[in-house]
């Protein structure tokens, strides 16, 4: 395996001085778009695709994590864009503004206890079983939530980084996000917040007063600016990650796309590479994707439901 990257770090975080309250969702499926029951014929086609291939590159998107309670950006009626006028922070804005960085880290600090405690769902668990069964070459995930690693998958490439690490923009030093939470606890002992909705990258809404009073640390090694080790909108995927993905797609025998519309080019170009190389492509998603015309098989449905229904057949056949 070439340059597999995972964001797993050992949890050492304890909720300390801040009082952070979260309202319980009525269902973990709050952020999953409505869809019809997947047809048995489509289940069989997807099962046969996985049965036939033993070196699959799997590309996952935000649609697989909605079943764990993390919203995506674009799902009709339930995504962040449908529920809020707020948009994700741009890379240039984060780097260029102390005010924007303070707001980002304040929101991220309050959202972290819940975001970091979210558990893998059936999709992550089935992919781990497929990996154990030697069906998977690698999992390329566009998600930053660490859920593949939590499920036990080891062959993971984090295309857009991980929210579970923090990097210095000056010296490139990296620390575990749990360690930063301890530092933020000490710097902000009186922080109190209530939140209704977590964001795809783990932050929440706060009042202007709460943001203005929030203290953000600098890098302990050089005094530089700290940034989550994720690819913000407007940023570029590191070259070594791009090359790792290209290598693994080239040496795979197929591409399986799960829970992604492939709206961002960093994901879509993986489908293009596979198609140009003659690799068969299967897609499981709710709604249209940018690569539908490249796919040999397109199945509509919830990833966790569909994969759970066919996993026993796949793994025992």
Regions found by a protein language model. Give the residues of each.
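Conserved catalytic core of sirtuin-type NAD+-dependent deacylases
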Residues: 1-317
